[in-house]
Every structure is written in structure tokens, then in C-alpha cells.
Amino acid sequence: MQPQYRNTVERMYRGTFFYNFNNRPILSRRNTVWLCYEVKTRGPSMPTWDTKIFRGQVLRSKAKYHPEMRFLHWFREWRQLHHDQEYKVTWYVSWSPCTRCANSVATFLAKDPKVTLTIFVARLYYFWKPDYQQALRILCQKRGGLHATMKIMNYNEFQDCWNKFVDGGGKPFKPRNNLPKHYTLLQATLGELLRHLMDPGTFTSNFNNKPWVSGQHETYLCYKVERLHNDTWVPLNQHRGFLRNQAPNIHGFPKGRHAELCFLDLIPFWKLDGQQYRVTCFTSWSPCFSCAQEMAKFISNNEHLSLCIFAARIYDDQGRYQEGLRTLHRDGAKIAMMNYSEFKHCWDTFVDRQGRPFQPWDGLDEHSQALSERLRAILQNQGN
């Protein structure tokens, strides 16, 4: 017996998809929420049981008209007939859930442990409001198991959504030019909102400060922001997180994008006022020449913002990296190598350590001292 479908459509037009699933972080006149869902029965083959689309007006005062609530109403009826079956549910939504919908979904999942939900969102709805942030944290928090997994749609998810739910007329999905940049902004914002933490193995592998390492082609950048108030630097915990470089051909970046440039994209999105701010970055590699030049330009154009960079290792591409570091230092950035204190601070602040203390690796202090001397020589233009 199949359940009755209400307020659903099978496919959407191409124009509807591009208009509503535009991932520009701030958009107006997008009052309809589109929720494309896929339900699979859990098992070795995980066959797809159903795929359809709910839609609803996001600004309606009654949350029952929102597509998330319509899905829950429909799915509850189905679960009454198939309460023993385990399901894996995937949503592709144009807006992330509002506060009431997020709370309702969290309650539903808490009562039905046989259902797992992954939510891919094109944009974040009212992400700057504290009550909304708290609702999403409750929805995605761990309570004996992950309740819901929420991710920003990247190129692959947009393509999957296009293939499964759009009447594309046989044409392939063609992303907008700014899709990768917007993805990075939204991904970092969601990480701040949900207070994502780094895996311990990722931290120790990428932030190990051995001067010469092989296979470490990624750059991780942890950041925090403070505001000067009555001669005291006050942490802004809403702007704290980490990001990594985007590799070529991943998430729609044909040429890739370094972590420092992704971070520079993010700062204007915070809309900081004219007060004095201090931004501190902890990076697994020091900036390359191009990134150092861009960071120098940024702080020169934003005199109310000071920048401190603590690097685990010096990025040596045999090019103009030394010149870039000197330019960045000359334009006002503080650049230093991470020592035990900074490594411990990163571990305590950005890593999912689960109560475990930071354990320094062999040679940490010696490597830090040697790298500090090398950096000092570079900044003083004495070679390396």
C-alpha cells in the first residue's frame, strides 16, 4: 500500500531549480521552500523507495505549511504501517529549516531511532539569529548517535539534485560561476553555527611541525576573532572555526583555492563594524606568495582589523614565498611559528578532543625553535 501524496510534484522545471536553488548566501524574494526528498530502505543494497518534492511558503505564519512539516506528516502516516523498517532519508532543500521546523524534526528523530536524516541545504535561513542557531544545533547534536547530518550543497549535490528531481531536458547541470565561493562561505558559516570541531587525527597529522613532511598537500586554517572593548580583547565566539583549502576539481573549484583566500572571502560576510578587531589564524602551512600578497592588501584596506598568523610549518615552494612573508609582515601582520602554547590552544579550542589533553609529539619544541629562527631570518631579509 502506497501512502497518498499531498502538496508534492514529481519534477521541477530548470528555471525553477536555478531560481530557488541559487546558493548566493543573501537573497531576497525567495519565499518558496523546495524540499526534494529521497527515502531508501536500509540494508545491504539500500534500494530507493521513493523520491518526490514538497514545496511551501517559508513566510507563512503557520509552520504546518512548510515543506518540512508536510514531509513529517506524510512520513509519520507511512511509518505507522511500516514501523519495523529502517530508513535512510535524504533532503535537498533550497532553505535550511526554520526554528519551529528544526525543533519538530529533532523531536521526530529522537522518537524514531530507525530513521537517519541527511539534509543538504542550498542556503541558510536566518543564520544570524540566536534562536535559529540553537535550533539547528539541537537538530544536529549527538545524543547517543547523530540525529541529523546537515551539509551545504556542493557541486556534487547540486548535480545529484538536478539529475534526480529536475526536468532538465537531457541537458547537464551547469553551475553558476560563484557556486564554489558561495559554498565556501556557507560551509564556514554552518561550521561556526554548529560549532564543528576537527578530528584529532586530522589535527595531529596536518599540524605536526616537522620541518620536512611528505604527503601533506592540504592547508588547514583555524581562526578566532576578538573585539577591543575598554582596552580588553573580548572573544567573539560566533566567529570561530576552521577551514581548509579547496582542492582542484573538488566542490566546483577547477583550479582549487587556498585556505587563506577562502578565509578572506569569509571575513566581509561577517559584516564587522568600525570597531577594532583582532583576527588570529593558526595555519598548518605559512601563506604562499600569492596568498600573502592578498592578505597584505586586505589588512591595508581594513585598518580597524589586525591580523596575527601562527604557522606550524613554513611553506617553501622554491619561489617568492619569502618576499610574500616580508610584504605581509611589513604591512602590519604579526607572523610567528606555533610553539607548545599555540598547539595546545588549538587542540583545546578547535579539536574534538573529548576530554583528552594535548600530547606533544617528539621534537615539537626543537622544531618550533628552529622554524622561528628561520622565519626571523626571512623577515629580516637574511635568507633562509
UniProtKB/Swiss-Prot annotation:
Entry's localization field: Cytoplasm; Nucleus; Cytoplasm, P-body
Binding site for Zn(2+) 1: 66, 98, 101
Tagged with keyword Glycoprotein: no
The CMP/dCMP-type deaminase domain, residue ranges: 29-139, 215-328
Record GO biological process: cytidine deamination; cytidine to uridine editing; defense response to virus; DNA cytosine deamination; innate immune response; negative regulation of single stranded viral RNA replication via double stranded DNA intermediate; transposable element silencing
Cytoplasm as UniProt keyword: yes
Site (Interaction with DNA): 245
GO molecular function, one term: zinc ion binding
Protein name, UniProt field: DNA dC->dU-editing enzyme APOBEC-3G
Region (Necessary for homooligomerization): 210-336
Lineage of producing organism: Eukaryota, Metazoa, Chordata, Craniata, Vertebrata
Top EC category: hydrolase
Alphabetically ordered keywords of this record: Antiviral defense, Cytoplasm, Hydrolase, Immunity, Innate immunity, Metal-binding, Nucleus, Phosphoprotein, Repeat, Zinc
Family annotation (CDD domains): cytidine_deaminase
Modification Phosphothreonine, positions: 32, 219
Function summary: DNA deaminase (cytidine deaminase) which acts as an inhibitor of retrovirus replication and retrotransposon mobility. After the penetration of retroviral nucleocapsids into target cells of infection and the initiation of reverse transcription, it can induce the conversion of cytosine to uracil in the minus-sense single-strand viral DNA, leading to G-to-A hypermutations in the subsequent plus-strand viral DNA.
Catalysis performed (reactions): a 2'-deoxycytidine in single-stranded DNA + H2O + H(+) = a 2'-deoxyuridine in single-stranded DNA + NH4(+)
Essential for cytoplasmic localization as annotated region, ranges: 1-61
Subunit structure: Homodimer. Homooligomer. Can bind RNA to form ribonucleoprotein complexes of high-molecular-mass (HMM) or low-molecular-mass (LMM). HMM is inactive and heterogeneous in protein composition because of binding nonselectively to cellular RNAs, which in turn are associated with variety of cellular proteins. The LMM form which is enzymatically active has few or no RNAs associated. Its ability to form homooligomer is distinct from its ability to assemble into HMM. Interacts with APOBEC3B, APOBEC3F, MOV10, AGO2, EIF4E, EIF4ENIF1, DCP2 and DDX6 in an RNA-dependent manner.
Recorded family membership: Belongs to the cytidine and deoxycytidylate deaminase family.
Coiled-coil stretches noted in the UniProt entry, renumbered to this chain: none
Region (Interaction with DNA): 214-216, 313-320
